[in-house]
Each structure stands twice: as C-alpha cells, then as structure tokens.
C-alpha cells in the first residue's frame, strides 16, 4: 500500500508543479490588477506570499519585485522599496544580463530611489553603471543615455 501511494504521488508531481506555476502566474496577474487599481497593500501582500523561484522564471520574479517596489514607493516605505528594487536589479543582471534594456532600466530605477533618499554616492554609482552599459549598447546619443546623463548632472550638483 505504501508503494502504491508513493507511486501515485510521484506520478502526479510534475502535474502538481505545472499547476503551481499556473496558479502563481494567475496570482501575478491579480497583483498587477491590484497595482493598476492603486490597492498597494494587496500588491505587497500577494508579492510577499508568491512562491516564485527566481531561477525557474526570472522574468516573473523581476516583475513581482518591480510591482512590490512600486507599491512600497506609493506607500512611502522607501527602505522596503529599495530592497525590492535592488532585488529586481540583481535578478535582471544575473539572469538577463546587461544586453536587456530592462536591466539598465532597473539600475536607473534604483538610482532614482537612492537619489530621492539623498543617498548620492549610491545613486551616482547606479546612474554611471547604467550609463556605461547603455552607451555600449545604443551609443551616447540614445534617449536613455541622455536621460542618465541628466540624472548624473542633477545628483552631482
């Protein structure tokens, strides 16, 4: 009897894993709807409870951290927002690389928050790093490169 239960469990395990991924994706969609409806407490509640594995779906994880960070910003909880933006940036850098424009944008977002919190050195480091990668990717005349130069100029002044 134990063998039969063991066999049933392991034969269903891939299906359970697939259902879990689908369920978590649905919860991500719900979290985004809460964000659009400005229900930031529920965004944070769902983002905190999601069981997403960074290595399985880095894009989904990055989105969760992004919306979580934005919700914390809207609620003016900047320390938690910094943590979430930093996590999003680190994941994008690790799994997607600097070739992805979203990685540069995540670095910029983190810099903006550092700047807002008067953490000038951290902000400058983010802006300069993002600028360097943006110039390599799209040249110094790109719109993003120009925006990053403006951020650097403002923080330096």
Annotate each predicted stretch with a short phrase.
Residues 1-157:
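Intrinsic-disorder-linked linear interaction elements in eukaryotic regulatory proteins
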